[in-house]
Amino acid sequence: MQTQILERMESEVRTYSRSFPTVFTEAKGARLHAEDGNQYIDFLAGAGTLNYGHNHPKLKQALADYIASDGIVHGLDMWSAAKRDYLETLEEVILKPRGLDYKVHLPGPTGTNAVEAAIRLARNAKGRHNIVTFTNGFHGVTMGALATTGNRKFREATGGIPTQGASFMPFDGYMGEGVDTLSYFEKLLGDNSGGLDVPAAVIIETVQGEGGINPAGIPWLQRLEKICRDHDMLLIVDDIQAGCGRTGKFFSFEHAGITPDIVTNSKSLSGFGLPFAHVLMRPELDIWKPGQYNGTFRGFNLAFVTAAAAMRHFWSDDTFERDVQRKGRVVEDRFQKLASFMTEKGHPASERGRGLMRGLDVGDGDMADKITAQAFKNGLIIETSGHSGQVIKCLCPLTITDEDLVGGLDILEQSVKEVFGQA
């Protein structure tokens, strides 16, 4: 296995190649194959970008057929047959059945593009600059999105340029069990001397991913929506990692029965790992002037093709979402048992999440790193998240077979016991 050119030429900023130091050559479903002959079960799935697995045959065929037909690949924001099909499918398969009426902005290929566009739109729509965000939230690393991201590691990488225009509030559960964090927010909103500039919008992940798999409670989300309505603030749901079925519903906010003013999607939106993002907005918020927010790669037709194919194949009825919810219960049960095992061994641990977005909080980053490193040696790829990397994070493909799901969980259990000297 030759890695010299990779180690010599790629920037020190790389991360995943340090955690999983091998050269991958092919992938299918929830399996990755490496150059040295080893294979791995994938509980990372491109950090939530491969909800439908690697190289899903239906999506691969749709893409191959489109390329073979000399279909438009790059067209800026010009109209194409692929874009038309994508928008029609989005409306008919996803939006209308959920009673949602949104216009679509295609801002560029990444999630942070979508967040930048969303917060800029909110500021223009309300004529106010402040965006309320939450502790442990992650919304991207470009300057506008970074201002709403809590992680100090990312915020310190600006070279001294201050991040501005956002105010942080405590997320649900941040202050401990039983503490009503929204009452604090409401108190500031009602106090002209509280120091909080009147917000244009609130941005929220219903389940925080990078922050440690922290699910906001359903009543908490419903109350947050009401606060936004009562105080003339827009509600932005960042569904970049939690969306596209990850929590067991296409949109993660469906569990709470709320209707955001603006939604951002990316990661698994293309269905195939292709770079793609969109912003959904209530029609009356579409106040952009032509070309006011643009980008060279805002019309990636290959992603239109695979995204439309994914929506038709997986979301035309509720069969897929029920299967995701079933698998989520399997992971939840196994993670709870692992948490109990660790706690009994004197190392308190806990499980949390929603759907197939689940975390095992082992208390400290060193322990989590030992377990995930051992899991990699045993044939499982799984990462960590949280303020100190203390949460082992399951983001396996939603399409994973029961055999691979149980196999991956068995490897994780084996790895935990090996770290504790019990194997």
From Swiss-Prot:
<keyword id="KW-0032">Aminotransferase</keyword>
<dbReference type="InterPro" id="IPR015422">
    <property type="entry name" value="PyrdxlP-dep_Trfase_small"/>
</dbReference>
<dbReference type="GO" id="GO:0047307">
    <property type="term" value="F:diaminobutyrate-pyruvate transaminase activity"/>
</dbReference>
<dbReference type="GO" id="GO:0019491">
    <property type="term" value="P:ectoine biosynthetic process"/>
</dbReference>
<dbReference type="InterPro" id="IPR004637">
    <property type="entry name" value="Dat"/>
</dbReference>
<dbReference type="GO" id="GO:0045303">
    <property type="term" value="F:diaminobutyrate-2-oxoglutarate transaminase activity"/>
</dbReference>
<dbReference type="Pfam" id="PF00202">
    <property type="entry name" value="Aminotran_3"/>
</dbReference>
<keyword id="KW-0663">Pyridoxal phosphate</keyword>
<dbReference type="InterPro" id="IPR049704">
    <property type="entry name" value="Aminotrans_3_PPA_site"/>
</dbReference>
<protein>
    <recommendedName>
        <fullName>Diaminobutyrate--2-oxoglutarate transaminase</fullName>
        <ecNumber>2.6.1.76</ecNumber>
    </recommendedName>
</protein>
<dbReference type="InterPro" id="IPR015421">
    <property type="entry name" value="PyrdxlP-dep_Trfase_major"/>
</dbReference>
<dbReference type="InterPro" id="IPR012773">
    <property type="entry name" value="Ectoine_EctB"/>
</dbReference>
<feature type="modified residue" description="N6-(pyridoxal phosphate)lysine">
    <location>
        <position position="267"/>
    </location>
</feature>
<dbReference type="GO" id="GO:0030170">
    <property type="term" value="F:pyridoxal phosphate binding"/>
</dbReference>
<keyword id="KW-0808">Transferase</keyword>
<dbReference type="InterPro" id="IPR005814">
    <property type="entry name" value="Aminotrans_3"/>
</dbReference>
<comment type="subunit">
    <text>Homohexamer.</text>
</comment>
<comment type="pathway">
    <text>Amine and polyamine biosynthesis; ectoine biosynthesis; L-ectoine from L-aspartate 4-semialdehyde: step 1/3.</text>
</comment>
<dbReference type="InterPro" id="IPR015424">
    <property type="entry name" value="PyrdxlP-dep_Trfase"/>
</dbReference>
<comment type="similarity">
    <text>Belongs to the class-III pyridoxal-phosphate-dependent aminotransferase family.</text>
</comment>
